């Protein structure tokens, strides 16, 4: 939690204040800011949903290792932290969804679902459980290095690398690009937290499939998180690379995967069969 709060503080001190002065000097900076913000938001957002989530956590498709690292870097550089920690936490969430053992269910409170779970000892995952839940990631030397022997130092390492990355952006491209990239990374960091907070609340969204928990499809969360908000679909069919399964359920990450597929960079895409969808459909769509 400390590293994440420090990240937000860094944004306030070095980004927002300096950016105001840049706007006053050059109106062109506004368009530069918006362009960089959009590109950086896509880079970091796709890094989380396509990288950490659909690739590492659920293995719903395959890409060359160099591309895997490139995609995952987008999530790492917006302080998602150790991929091993992220994946083990997420796999545990699916195992105990909305039940005792779920790391970040909103049934334990809104603050808990958004950020509070990150520093509660009750949701910490031991090294032994982590190796059981994510043996595939432990076989990867880079992910083991970023995990720093299952200690709190993995967050400090992620923070340090992120600071160096953004210092390089400031040095090479100036304060406008720096501020835009930093703000985009903060927004991307918050997107999966919105999924935790709003996509398991019975009073929001709707359920298309019966999957034994409170997962909901929430359209505006799906827009902000590149398809993650179709959360009921995902919980019903966690191995599916496509989350937006219904009419009008826009899934930017799924579109991005199809774009990469045009160049032969994606293979073994996992999708649900129609008979499986029919089995899971609920009679009462709330």
Where would I find each of the regions flagged by the language model?
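Active-site-proximal inter-transmembrane loops
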Residues: 137-145, 204-230, 236-237
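Non-catalytic, topology-defining segments of multipass membrane proteins
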Residues: 1-194, 198-199, 240-286
């Amino acid at each position: 939690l400390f590293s994440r709060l420090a990240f937000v503080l860094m944004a306030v001190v070095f980004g927002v204040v300096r950016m105001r002065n840049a706007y006053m000097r050059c109106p062109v900076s506004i368009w530069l800011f918006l362009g960089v913000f959009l590109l950086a938001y896509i880079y970091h957002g796709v890094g989380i949903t396509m990288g950490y989530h659909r690739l590492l956590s659920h293995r719903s498709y395959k890409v060359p290792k160099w591309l895997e690292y490139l995609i995952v870097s987008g999530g790492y550089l917006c302080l998602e932290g150790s991929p091993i920690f992220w994946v083990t936490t997420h796999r545990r969430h699916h195992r105990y969804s909305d039940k005792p053992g779920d790391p970040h269910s909103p049934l334990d409170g809104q603050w808990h679902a958004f950020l509070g779970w990150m520093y509660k000892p009750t949701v910490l995952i031991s090294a032994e459980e982590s190796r059981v839940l994510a043996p595939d990631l432990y076989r990867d030397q880079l992910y083991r290095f970023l995990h720093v022997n299952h200690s709190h130092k993995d967050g400090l390492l992620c923070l340090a690398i992120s600071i160096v990355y953004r210092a390089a952006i400031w040095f090479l491209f100036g304060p406008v690009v720096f501020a835009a990239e930093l703000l985009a990374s903060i927004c991307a960091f918050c997107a999966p937290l919105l999924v935790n907070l709003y996509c398991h609340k019975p009073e929001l969204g709707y359920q298309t499939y019966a999957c034994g928990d409170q997962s909901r499809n929430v359209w505006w969360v799906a827009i902000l998180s590149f398809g993650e908000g179709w959360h009921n679909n995902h919980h019903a069919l966690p191995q599916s690379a496509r989350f937006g399964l219904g009419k009008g359920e826009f899934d930017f990450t799924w579109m991005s995967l199809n774009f990469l597929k045009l160049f032969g960079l994606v293979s073994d895409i996992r999708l649900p069969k129609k008979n499986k969808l029919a089995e899971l459909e609920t009679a009462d769509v709330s």
